[in-house]
Amino acid sequence: MSKQQKILFIDRDGTLIVEPPVDFQVDRLDKLKLEPFVIPSLLSLQDAGYRLVMVTNQDGLGTDSYPQEDFDAPHNMMMEIFESQGVKFDDVLICPHFEKDNCSCRKPKLGLVKEYLQAGKVDFQNSFVIGDRQTDLQLAENMAIRGIQYNPEIMGWKRILKDLTVKARVAEVVRTTKETDIKVFVNLDEQGGNAISTGLGFFDHMLDQIATHGGFQMVCKVEGDLHIDDHHTVEDTALALGQALKEALGDKRGIGRFGFSLPMDECLAQCALDLSGRPYLKFDAQFSREQVGDLSTEMVVHFFRSLTDTLACTLHLSSAGNNDHHIIESLFKAFGRTLRQAIKVEGTELPSSKGVL
């Protein structure tokens, strides 16, 4: 196992399999029962990049009160079921002692997981202990990672899967220079509630087109040196927006990555987008006026160039028509509609054969 892996340290009885309420021992095959949705959830968690390690206390295992052979039959059957369905545990760590034995390996002590901690195998920000008991949460605290208390009613495997794989795709970027003071917030999984104020009415409208057609929420407040011109305001807003979108996308796991759009009004706007991690812009649009509203038409291409720089995307964008207002609006709409396709979550895989975007 390479260093710094996302690892789930998972309890067995009461978390992976049902714990018998009378004697708390799964010592016969007829007592073996999987917790609801555990297999599809573990498969999806594996697909999301998590490694699985089982960590379990088995009181008195190997003694007369809990003979090894009584444990082995249902345990081996459980492992065979998991393996047959594609669920792979990197390790199965078992403490066989009673609490009174005061051993160093019984949860919540660190003996069982000591090797993982000392070898630097654990990604502390993205690893978890999952178990049904307070001792599991205490183990997580002792390991300096987060704990999830399993409960089939309120925190079952479906909920755990959602919490660990569907992360909030939000970001806020504050950018302050001598020319501008900008705050941009985006939420890629919410729509509506856009609040955009740049001091340029037409530019506000264009940014709203990106968010509305992109299917995400944008809050953008800009104070710039408009007494000079609109250059710094437009450029720095684009840089901040691109950075916010990039941060909200995270590692881009599961997204569509690509988008294509050809909307038709009296203008033909074409847009192709690849969230490739590499900035490149090919822009083709001609304007007959110096301004539309309070926005300089020369700043349209500059906006998209600055945006591609911080978003780190490949963008081909063009529009042709007779009305500059409609041409510009079609560019922003087409980009928003294309971005909607590219940021949509379609699965859990990283959309790159290189393993990174």
From Swiss-Prot:
Subcellular location, principal: cytoplasm
Co-factor requirement: Mg(2+); Zn(2+)
Keyword Hydrolase attributed: yes
EC number(s) recorded for this UniProt protein: 3.1.3.15, 4.2.1.19
SUPFAM superfamilies: HAD-like, Ribosomal protein S5 domain 2-like
Residues that coordinate or bind Mg(2+): 11, 13, 132
Localization in the cell: Cytoplasm
The protein's annotated pathway: Amino-acid biosynthesis; L-histidine biosynthesis; L-histidine from 5-phospho-alpha-D-ribose 1-diphosphate: step 6/9; Amino-acid biosynthesis; L-histidine biosynthesis; L-histidine from 5-phospho-alpha-D-ribose 1-diphosphate: step 8/9
Region span, Imidazoleglycerol-phosphate dehydratase: 169-357
Alphabetized InterPro entries for the sequence: HAD-like_sf (IPR036412), HAD-SF_hydro_IIIA (IPR006549), HAD_sf (IPR023214), His_synth_bifunc_HisB (IPR020566), HisB_N (IPR005954), Histidinol-phos (IPR006543), IGPD_sf (IPR038494), ImidazoleglycerolP_deHydtase (IPR000807)
Catalyzed chemical reaction(s): D-erythro-1-(imidazol-4-yl)glycerol 3-phosphate = 3-(imidazol-4-yl)-2-oxopropyl phosphate + H2O; L-histidinol phosphate + H2O = L-histidinol + phosphate
Cross-referenced Gene3D superfamilies: HAD superfamily/HAD-like (3.40.50.1000), Imidazole glycerol phosphate dehydratase, domain 1 (3.30.230.40)
One GO cellular component term: cytoplasm
GO process annotations (BP): L-histidine biosynthetic process
Protein name: Histidine biosynthesis bifunctional protein HisB
Provenance organism: Vibrio vulnificus (strain CMCP6)
Taxonomic lineage from the root: Bacteria, Pseudomonadati, Pseudomonadota, Gammaproteobacteria, Vibrionales
